[in-house]
Amino acid sequence: MNFPKVGSKIQIQSYKHNGSIHRIWEETIVLKGTSKVVIGGNDRILVKESDGRHWRTREPAICYFDSEQWFNTIGMIRADGIYFYCNLGTPFTWDEEALKYIDYDLDIKVFPDMTFKLLDEDEYAMHRKMMKYPPEIDRILQRSVDELVSWIHQRKGPFAPQFVESWYERFLQYR
């Protein structure tokens, strides 16, 4: 299987459990692309929502996708520090068209001091009923929230000191 090449521009597509498109991020530059991990960088890119709305991101960001974890992270570089937005969802797939995953509603926002907040539990509860998430998905997601919190506490993976900054330096080489 081919994986996105370093320096190439890719699209990121998130879907819902029922197969409908949720959100599309245009033009993320691949900084690392392997069977296990894809790391990308972007800045002020267009994001299209499933309801037709669209908007631009406000700051540079480093995205981290892991083929074994049910979450991905976006490290947003702001004047007052690095914020993370973490999406709970399936491990990524790559099919030459885009990097894809299924979004399962729950999110964790991490602040520069590494405190964090679990978000969208109400949306998850609603979609779990509406889209009939199987019990196994619920178990996987609860374990994944725990794993993600552990990574935050341990400063592991994308939360490691200088992770976002060093990948951002590489991103600047492609701009």
From Swiss-Prot:
The active site is at R23. It catalyses: a ribonucleoside 5'-triphosphate + H2O = a ribonucleoside 5'-diphosphate + phosphate + H(+); a ribonucleoside 5'-diphosphate + H2O = a ribonucleoside 5'-phosphate + phosphate + H(+). Keywords: Hydrolase, Magnesium, Metal-binding. The keyword Metal-binding applies. This is Nucleoside triphosphate/diphosphate phosphatase. Its EC number is 3.6.1.15, 3.6.1.6. Mg(2+) 2 binds at D105, D107, D120, E123. InterPro entries: DUF402, FomD-like_sf, Ntdp-like, SA1684.
